[in-house]
Amino acid sequence: MPHRRSAYFVSDRTGITAESLGNALLTQFDMLEFKRETIPFIDTADKAMAVAEQIRQRAQSDHFRPLVFVSIVNPFVREAIQVDDCAMVIDFFHAFVGQLENELEQKATLTVGKSHGIISEEKYDTRIEAVNFSLNHDDGVKLKDLAEADVILVGVSRSGKTPTCLYLALQYGIKAANYPLTPEDLDSPTLPKMLLPYRKKIFGLTIEPQRLHHIRNERKPDSRYASIDNCRREVNEAESLFRHHGVPFISTTHKSIEEIASTILHHTGISRRF
């Protein structure tokens, strides 16, 4: 079995950018295992030198060069991470900012935290408002104000509606409500009455019965709710309902939350709100 390689994500802010880009690259090597560690808020030379020492020690103990993904704006802080002799360093920020400066004929401002900090109060408020809306309209708990929803996700229980709604709210500022199709809903050939006025906002989520059975069985083992026969019935009836009413839908079985959200935006034409 291949040796597990150490991978560091080093950032002057939250580490989200370094993690996202770094993991996007590492996932292309699915035959290897990685020991991942995120080190955020490295915003001084002293902190950077401490990180460099940590990486050096890891290189010694592993006998393999660690992979270091860096997203640090300040060049003096970045230069303090002197580990190029014992690690492979991928500097996301400075690898591209110089090329952009040349192309745009303008110097970068080199401002820390513009990707994930609160740059605009209006944009931040839009995100928080969307999150609150999604939380208040989760699982059909609150059907009031659905007219304000940008999209209403509909599907059987445990098909991925709630995490997708929250992701849409957090990442795009989209007001996403969701409604779980109950056995009573599935016995009817029509959409639930309370959803009919918002037909054009509905987007369906489905899932393979075997996967649904596995998820439900972890929550309520050996119950009728989790039985494979019941899962097959609910999924088949939900998909029939979607087709009958022309509701667009996708399977969440082999998709990440990010992929589900992107697919919904692509199908519906909804754009980010900030």
UniProtKB/Swiss-Prot annotation:
UniProt similarity note: Belongs to the pyruvate, phosphate/water dikinase regulatory protein family. PSRP subfamily.
Keywords recorded for this protein, A-Z: Kinase, Nucleotide-binding, Serine/threonine-protein kinase, Transferase
Recorded catalytic activity of this chain's protein: [pyruvate, water dikinase] + ADP = [pyruvate, water dikinase]-phosphate + AMP + H(+); [pyruvate, water dikinase]-phosphate + phosphate + H(+) = [pyruvate, water dikinase] + diphosphate
GO molecular function list: ADP binding; ATP binding; phosphotransferase activity, phosphate group as acceptor; protein serine/threonine kinase activity
Matching NCBIfam families: PRK05339.1 (NF003742)
Coiled-coil annotated spans: none
Listed HAMAP family: PSRP (MF_01062)
Protein name, UniProt field: Putative phosphoenolpyruvate synthase regulatory protein
Residue spans crossing the bilayer: none
EC number assigned by the record: 2.7.11.33, 2.7.4.28
Organism: Laribacter hongkongensis (strain HLHK9)
Source taxonomy: Bacteria, Pseudomonadati, Pseudomonadota, Betaproteobacteria, Neisseriales
Function comment: Bifunctional serine/threonine kinase and phosphorylase involved in the regulation of the phosphoenolpyruvate synthase (PEPS) by catalyzing its phosphorylation/dephosphorylation.
Pfam hit, one: Kinase-PPPase
Binding site for ADP: 155-162
